[in-house]
UniProtKB/Swiss-Prot annotation:
Heterotetramer of 2 nbp35 and 2 cfd1 chains. One of its GO terms (molecular function) is ATP binding. [4Fe-4S] cluster 2 binds at C257, C260. Residues 23-42 are annotated as: Disordered. Belongs to the Mrp/NBP35 ATP-binding proteins family. NUBP1/NBP35 subfamily. Keywords: 4Fe-4S, ATP-binding, Cytoplasm, Iron, Iron-sulfur, Metal-binding, Nucleotide-binding. This is Cytosolic Fe-S cluster assembly factor nbp35. GO terms for cellular component: cytosol. InterPro entries: Mrp-like_CS, Mrp/NBP35_ATP-bd, NUBP1/Nbp35, P-loop_NTPase, YlxH/NBP35. It is found in: Cytoplasm. PANTHER family: CYTOSOLIC FE-S CLUSTER ASSEMBLY FACTOR NUBP1, NUCLEOTIDE-BINDING PROTEIN NBP35 YEAST -RELATED. The keyword Nucleotide-binding applies.
Amino acid sequence: MAPSLEEPTAANIDALSKTAPNLVAPEPEHCPGPESEQAGKGDACAGCPNQNICATAPKGPDPDVAIITERLSQIRHKILVLSGKGGVGKSTFSSLLAHAFAANPDSDVGIMDTDLCGPSIAKMMGVEAETIHVSNAGWSPVWVTDNLGAMSIQFMLPNRDDAIIWRGPKKNGLIKQFLKDVDWGELDYLIVDTPPGTSDEHLSVNSLLKESGVDGAVIVTTPQEVSLQDVRKEIDFCRKAGIRILGLVENMSGFVCTNCGHESTIFRATTGGGKRLAKKMGIPFLGSVPLDPRIGQACDYGESFVDAFPDSPASTAIKQRSNGFGVYGMEKCDTIFKTADLADTREY
């Protein structure tokens, strides 16, 4: 089908899905897992690029997992924010979500930046120049407000523009320190902002948090197929890793003029967008967040967009539950996520 700027029809979308290529080769089967005694030694490991790493890695349960579980036992809800591709607004959404939770003065909120090579949460929260303080209780998070704390590698850099050039083991070690040593105290919500894709950081966070209990993951996308194709991989990763998918959020879904209120489509959903994908993959669609240039300005200045522009359509989408995902004054994550929009079967 030739490229076109016209709105795609349902027939065109179905035709695209039918012609989608299959994997050239099936994925490896019967992997014993990195913690197994047979890791790197079994017949299924032959030819695997990670065979030597698995064979030489220490086996058995990680003793730090019990320490992390105890440390995080006072946190009621832990939410991962994932994206298949960079640039879809995952960290922006994480910061908006944190501010929206913290808008309830009775809620205590933490946000942890595990995107070690591209940390942006400190900047978005307006605390980029702060440093970590260490006490007998552990590392103290940087408090943005009385009920909103943040933790990021940015607080540890000698110079704010220093690059992080680390391999997997060193990244995993710092993530473990964030989970084991940071003294969050009692929190209602801990939001974990992750790097794009499915990398070492995701595996580390999942394995270290599994015992302490994670509510699940929110996946952020934009409407274009180039983003959705990576979301499918992210969904596959979550299912294989045993991470509950709370739902899909479509960011930058359109632009609403602040003067006349007219909504314009910026990134056309050539294959049906996030809602169609969520329906097809059997996960909740949590709603859409429109573009607003003031979001970028608020993030650059480290201000809460939700507080500064409470009547913006984007703020409304975050606060008042767009298609089943409401965060403003939320009492329990499960109550909201269980009522997310799985039943809407409209075609796009």
